[in-house]
Amino acid sequence: MDLILSAVLVLGAIALIAALVLFGVSKKFAVEEDPRLGQVGELLPGANCGGCGFAGCSGMAAALVKGADAGSIDGLMCPVGGADVMGKVADLLGLAVANTEAKVAVVRCNGSCEHRPRIAEYDGLHTCAAMNSCGAGETGCGFGCLGCGDCVAACQFGAISINPETGLPEVDEEKCAGCGACAKACPRHIIELRKKGPKGRRVYVQCVNHDKGAVAKKACSVACIGCGKCQKVCKFDAIIIEDNVAYVDFNKCRMCTKCVDECPTGALVKVNFPVKKKEE
């Protein structure tokens, strides 16, 4: 009995000493967390979408606190929370936030069944990534939308759906958070984040086909053929022609829409503009 009691006392003493040592070490080498990390984290939406460029909201919070210590959080933006959340974060950190314009996902392909006829049938895993790895897909265009919906699966906000009539993804601007997850999921990079623009108006080229004009037009009737007519009519140098396809720089575009009227194939589109009344 005495032997058992002695063993218990010895083990208890060892456990107590070990606990005291561990407590002392933890106090000595403890890394104190900046309380601002938790405060900023509570302001962020918690979507962990990665649209800010970090793995999640905790990474964004750390970057914001680090930026605050450096005196600026310019260049950091939470696309889900938008200007409201960034304003609250800036107030918390005692900084001024740059006026960052909201962005929305746009689908730069108009190759519906009507404009881009199917010439083959794909019989494999129903994902854009899998189909893209096999070649051009079911049409003659090796650049256009594959229509399997990888972008739809990637969207956490239900902002994208495949139109059953056109076979193309459509973005619900009211739901789109501008996180860019859909753009990352698209193997052909036809989805782009663009500034929403004043009153939601935008002008852009709805095509990414880099083939020469005749080849592109044969594959899709509304393809950009790189003719340069839009570039010539633009007075603001907002359009560039690179690798046989036009691109509108939204930082320079003044949305006069002359380029849209000049485009011979309809590859240039304008969104959310008022419908012009026909002259009687």
Where are these regions (language model features)?
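Strongly charged, low-complexity linkers/loops
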Residues: 229, 239-241, 245-247
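Ferredoxin-type iron-sulfur electron-transfer modules and their immediate structural context
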Residues: 2-233, 262, 266-280
